[in-house]
Amino acid sequence: MSYQSGTNKIFYKKNLSWTNNFVKSNIDKIERNYKKHPTRNRWNCNCHVIHDDDLDVEYINFDYLRKKYEKIVKNVTKKYNIEKYHLSDIWYNYYKKGQYQEVHTHAGNGGVTAVHYLLFNNKEHSHTHFIDKNIKSPKIKQGDILFFPCDLQHYVPENETTVPRLTTAFTITKH
Protein backbone atom coordinates (compact mmCIF):
# COMPACT_ATOMS: atom_id res chain seq x y z
CA MET A 1 0.00 0.00 0.00
CA SER A 2 1.47 3.39 -0.96
CA TYR A 3 0.75 6.74 0.63
CA GLN A 4 0.98 10.18 -0.88
CA SER A 5 2.33 13.21 0.88
CA GLY A 6 2.00 16.33 -1.21
CA THR A 7 2.70 15.30 -4.78
CA ASN A 8 5.31 12.65 -3.88
CA LYS A 9 4.64 9.04 -3.07
CA ILE A 10 7.07 8.71 -0.21
CA PHE A 11 5.62 6.00 2.04
CA TYR A 12 5.08 2.31 1.54
CA LYS A 13 3.29 0.40 4.30
CA LYS A 14 2.45 -3.28 4.74
CA ASN A 15 1.05 -5.25 7.66
CA LEU A 16 3.08 -8.33 8.61
CA SER A 17 0.85 -11.09 9.96
CA TRP A 18 3.68 -12.88 11.78
CA THR A 19 4.46 -9.90 14.06
CA ASN A 20 2.58 -11.07 17.17
CA ASN A 21 4.16 -14.54 17.11
CA PHE A 22 7.62 -12.99 16.79
CA VAL A 23 6.97 -10.69 19.76
CA LYS A 24 5.67 -13.58 21.91
CA SER A 25 8.82 -15.59 21.13
CA ASN A 26 11.24 -12.76 21.93
CA ILE A 27 9.68 -10.33 24.43
CA ASP A 28 11.13 -12.05 27.52
CA LYS A 29 14.66 -11.66 26.11
CA ILE A 30 13.96 -8.02 25.24
CA GLU A 31 12.74 -7.37 28.80
CA ARG A 32 15.86 -9.00 30.29
CA ASN A 33 18.10 -6.96 27.96
CA TYR A 34 16.21 -3.83 28.99
CA LYS A 35 16.80 -4.56 32.69
CA LYS A 36 20.55 -4.80 32.01
CA HIS A 37 20.76 -1.73 29.73
CA PRO A 38 17.63 0.49 29.95
CA THR A 39 19.13 3.38 27.98
CA ARG A 40 21.66 1.59 25.80
CA ASN A 41 21.94 3.07 22.31
CA ARG A 42 24.48 4.43 19.84
CA TRP A 43 22.83 7.85 19.57
CA ASN A 44 21.82 10.82 21.68
CA CYS A 45 18.46 9.59 22.93
CA ASN A 46 16.72 7.98 25.86
CA CYS A 47 15.70 4.54 24.65
CA HIS A 48 16.82 0.93 24.76
CA VAL A 49 18.38 -0.14 21.45
CA ILE A 50 19.98 -3.48 20.59
CA HIS A 51 21.63 -4.14 17.20
CA ASP A 52 22.02 -7.52 15.54
CA ASP A 53 25.80 -7.30 16.08
CA ASP A 54 25.63 -6.62 19.85
CA LEU A 55 27.22 -9.66 21.47
CA ASP A 56 26.84 -8.90 25.19
CA VAL A 57 23.04 -9.29 25.37
CA GLU A 58 20.50 -12.05 24.87
CA TYR A 59 20.07 -12.54 21.15
CA ILE A 60 16.59 -12.13 19.73
CA ASN A 61 15.95 -13.92 16.46
CA PHE A 62 17.43 -11.31 14.11
CA ASP A 63 18.14 -14.06 11.54
CA TYR A 64 14.41 -14.73 11.24
CA LEU A 65 13.76 -10.99 10.85
CA ARG A 66 16.41 -10.63 8.15
CA LYS A 67 14.90 -13.49 6.11
CA LYS A 68 11.39 -12.05 6.40
CA TYR A 69 12.54 -8.50 5.62
CA GLU A 70 14.59 -9.59 2.60
CA LYS A 71 11.41 -10.95 0.99
CA ILE A 72 9.62 -7.62 1.43
CA VAL A 73 12.61 -5.51 0.40
CA LYS A 74 12.63 -7.04 -3.09
CA ASN A 75 9.26 -5.39 -3.79
CA VAL A 76 10.04 -2.18 -1.93
CA THR A 77 13.20 -1.51 -3.91
CA LYS A 78 11.19 -1.73 -7.13
CA LYS A 79 8.70 0.85 -5.84
CA TYR A 80 11.55 3.23 -4.99
CA ASN A 81 13.45 2.50 -8.24
CA ILE A 82 16.46 1.07 -6.43
CA GLU A 83 18.32 -1.50 -8.52
CA LYS A 84 21.34 -2.33 -6.35
CA TYR A 85 21.11 -2.28 -2.58
CA HIS A 86 22.31 -3.70 0.71
CA LEU A 87 20.18 -4.37 3.78
CA SER A 88 21.90 -2.79 6.80
CA ASP A 89 22.11 -4.14 10.30
CA ILE A 90 18.78 -4.57 12.05
CA TRP A 91 18.07 -3.19 15.50
CA TYR A 92 15.19 -2.93 17.91
CA ASN A 93 14.03 0.12 19.86
CA TYR A 94 12.18 -0.47 23.12
CA TYR A 95 10.56 2.57 24.72
CA LYS A 96 9.13 2.57 28.20
CA LYS A 97 7.60 5.56 29.99
CA GLY A 98 9.66 8.73 29.46
CA GLN A 99 11.78 7.32 26.65
CA TYR A 100 12.11 8.85 23.17
CA GLN A 101 14.21 8.97 19.99
CA GLU A 102 15.87 12.23 18.93
CA VAL A 103 15.51 13.87 15.51
CA HIS A 104 17.64 11.92 13.03
CA THR A 105 18.04 10.55 9.53
CA HIS A 106 19.53 7.27 8.33
CA ALA A 107 22.66 6.87 6.22
CA GLY A 108 21.69 5.04 3.07
CA ASN A 109 23.02 6.87 0.03
CA GLY A 110 19.54 7.84 -1.12
CA GLY A 111 18.01 4.57 0.03
CA VAL A 112 15.03 3.75 2.21
CA THR A 113 14.43 3.40 5.96
CA ALA A 114 12.11 0.77 7.42
CA VAL A 115 10.33 0.84 10.79
CA HIS A 116 8.39 -2.25 11.87
CA TYR A 117 5.90 -1.60 14.69
CA LEU A 118 5.99 -4.77 16.80
CA LEU A 119 4.30 -3.46 19.96
CA PHE A 120 2.18 -0.46 19.08
CA ASN A 121 -1.16 0.77 20.34
CA ASN A 122 -2.35 3.78 18.37
CA LYS A 123 -4.43 4.90 21.37
CA GLU A 124 -1.38 4.81 23.67
CA HIS A 125 1.64 5.44 21.43
CA SER A 126 2.74 8.14 19.07
CA HIS A 127 3.56 7.35 15.46
CA THR A 128 6.91 8.32 13.93
CA HIS A 129 6.94 12.10 13.44
CA PHE A 130 8.55 13.88 10.49
CA ILE A 131 10.13 17.34 10.77
CA ASP A 132 8.84 18.52 7.40
CA LYS A 133 5.39 19.95 8.20
CA ASN A 134 4.20 19.01 4.69
CA ILE A 135 4.66 15.32 5.46
CA LYS A 136 1.83 13.64 7.32
CA SER A 137 2.60 10.30 8.90
CA PRO A 138 0.31 7.50 7.75
CA LYS A 139 -1.91 5.81 10.32
CA ILE A 140 -0.03 2.94 11.92
CA LYS A 141 -1.20 -0.18 13.68
CA GLN A 142 0.66 -3.03 15.35
CA GLY A 143 2.31 -5.25 12.75
CA ASP A 144 2.80 -2.51 10.16
CA ILE A 145 6.15 -1.94 8.51
CA LEU A 146 6.63 1.56 7.13
CA PHE A 147 9.20 2.48 4.46
CA PHE A 148 10.30 6.04 3.65
CA PRO A 149 13.33 7.82 2.15
CA CYS A 150 16.28 7.57 4.55
CA ASP A 151 17.05 11.29 4.38
CA LEU A 152 13.72 12.34 5.94
CA GLN A 153 14.28 13.81 9.39
CA HIS A 154 12.11 12.00 11.91
CA TYR A 155 11.80 11.27 15.62
CA VAL A 156 9.75 9.46 18.24
CA PRO A 157 8.18 11.64 20.94
CA GLU A 158 8.45 10.70 24.60
CA ASN A 159 6.40 7.65 25.56
CA GLU A 160 3.89 9.08 28.04
CA THR A 161 2.33 5.74 28.96
CA THR A 162 3.45 2.70 30.92
CA VAL A 163 2.70 0.52 27.88
CA PRO A 164 6.02 -0.31 26.13
CA ARG A 165 6.48 0.56 22.45
CA LEU A 166 8.69 -1.81 20.39
CA THR A 167 9.95 -1.30 16.85
CA THR A 168 12.65 -2.76 14.69
CA ALA A 169 14.43 -0.69 12.06
CA PHE A 170 16.88 -1.06 9.22
CA THR A 171 18.04 0.83 6.16
CA ILE A 172 18.08 -0.26 2.55
CA THR A 173 21.35 1.30 1.37
CA LYS A 174 21.45 2.21 -2.29
CA HIS A 175 24.59 1.28 -4.30
Each language-model region and where it sits:
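Short loop segments at secondary-structure junctions
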Residues: 16, 119-123, 175
